[in-house]
């Protein structure tokens, strides 16, 4: 008789525990829907104006980054949504876009967990658009090519060894070589918006400075001459949007100031 009573009590405890677990699981899976308003424009429909399209994503079933939400939308709701992405870890710069009013990388931009706040996503500002969130970076890369971003020397070691660099000279490149050319800084700059055909912009100028101070490079005079005109460099008015928005925490504004200083005392 005692064994029967103990078994009944144990069964009741297990049943209550199971019900509590089920209740907790149900609460956990209560949808947490957040609205993402995404810029849409299709070049195949030139008469249609650009617009914001709303999508709802359950934050319980989505990764923590904005790129996770965009991928989920594309995979499950709208396969026509177009954007660039690759590494998903802030290295390649492909997923640069304007999120919540700020240029950044979608793969390292965390989603605000407040479901009541809508999140607006646009392509990088003041650029020609290929489709949806994809900007045309042709001019940006042409400008980068124009500064000749590679080591230039008139002579090399005769024995075929590498061109060595001291630890101190190598440290001068810190904060410059890490640039991933995502264009977040350049497309946040009003001067670049005004004339991106002639003003090189923060990203390209920072790379120009990177080669100007590389102790192994022997084209310093040529590089300075290329920049010493009224448009390529001096359209920078130290607005500093570039430094504030850089997703890698770099300081293009400082690099531009250093170029100006080097030209002033050349």
Curated annotation (Swiss-Prot):
Its main location: mitochondrion. Residues 1-20 form a transit peptide. [4Fe-4S] cluster binds at residues 179, 182, 185, 246. Its EC number is 1.3.5.1. Pathway: Carbohydrate metabolism; tricarboxylic acid cycle; fumarate from succinate (eukaryal route): step 1/1. It is a peripheral membrane protein. CDD domains: fer2 (cd00207). Binds 1 [2Fe-2S] cluster. It is an enzyme of class 1 (oxidoreductase). It is found in: Mitochondrion inner membrane. GO terms for biological process: aerobic respiration; cellular respiration; mitochondrial electron transport, succinate to ubiquinone; respiratory electron transport chain; tricarboxylic acid cycle. Its cofactor is [2Fe-2S] cluster; [3Fe-4S] cluster; [4Fe-4S] cluster. [2Fe-2S] cluster binds at residues 87, 92, 95, 107. The keyword Magnesium does not apply. Residues 169-199 form the 4Fe-4S ferredoxin-type domain. Keywords: 2Fe-2S, 3Fe-4S, 4Fe-4S, Electron transport, Iron, Iron-sulfur, Membrane, Metal-binding, Mitochondrion, Mitochondrion inner membrane, Oxidoreductase, Transit peptide, Transport, Tricarboxylic acid cycle. Disulfide bonds: none annotated. It catalyses: a quinone + succinate = fumarate + a quinol. Residues 36-127 form the 2Fe-2S ferredoxin-type domain. [3Fe-4S] cluster binds at residues 189, 236, 242. GO terms for cellular component: mitochondrial inner membrane; mitochondrial membrane; mitochondrion; respiratory chain complex II (succinate dehydrogenase). The keyword Transferase does not apply. Gene3D superfamilies: 3.10.20.30, Alpha-helical ferredoxin. Belongs to the succinate dehydrogenase/fumarate reductase iron-sulfur protein family. Component of complex II composed of four subunits: a flavoprotein (FP), an iron-sulfur protein (IP), and a cytochrome b composed of a large and a small subunit. This is Succinate dehydrogenase [ubiquinone] iron-sulfur subunit, mitochondrial. It comes from Saccharomyces cerevisiae (strain ATCC 204508 / S288c) (Baker's yeast). The gene is SDH2.
């Amino acid at each position: 008789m005692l064994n029967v009573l103990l078994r009944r009590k144990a069964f009741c405890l297990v049943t209550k525990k199971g019900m509590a677990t089920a209740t907790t699981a149900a609460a956990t899976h209560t949808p947490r829907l957040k609205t993402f308003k995404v810029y849409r424009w299709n070049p195949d429909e030139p008469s249609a104006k650009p617009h914001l399209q709303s999508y709802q994503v359950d934050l319980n079933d989505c990764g923590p980054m904005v790129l996770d939400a965009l991928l989920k939308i594309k995979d499950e709701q709208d396969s026509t949504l177009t954007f660039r992405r690759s590494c998903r870890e802030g290295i390649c710069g492909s997923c640069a876009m304007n999120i919540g009013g700020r240029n950044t990388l979608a793969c390292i931009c965390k989603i605000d967990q407040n479901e009541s706040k809508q999140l607006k996503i646009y392509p990088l500002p003041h650029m020609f658009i290929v489709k949806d969130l994809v900007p045309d970076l042709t001019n940006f890369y042409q400008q980068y090519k124009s500064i000749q971003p590679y080591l230039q020397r008139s002579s090399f070691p005769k024995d075929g060894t590498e061109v060595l660099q001291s630890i101190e000279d190598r440290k001068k490149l810190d904060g410059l070589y890490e640039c991933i050319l995502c264009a977040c800084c350049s497309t946040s700059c009003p001067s670049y918006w005004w004339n991106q055909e002639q003003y090189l912009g923060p990203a390209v100028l920072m790379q120009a400075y990177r080669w100007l101070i590389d102790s192994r490079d022997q084209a310093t005079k040529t590089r300075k001459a290329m920049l010493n005109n009224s448009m390529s460099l001096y359209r920078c008015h130290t607005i500093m949007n570039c430094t504030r928005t850089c997703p890698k925490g770099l300081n293009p504004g400082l690099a531009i100031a250093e170029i100006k200083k080097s030209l002033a005392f050349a």
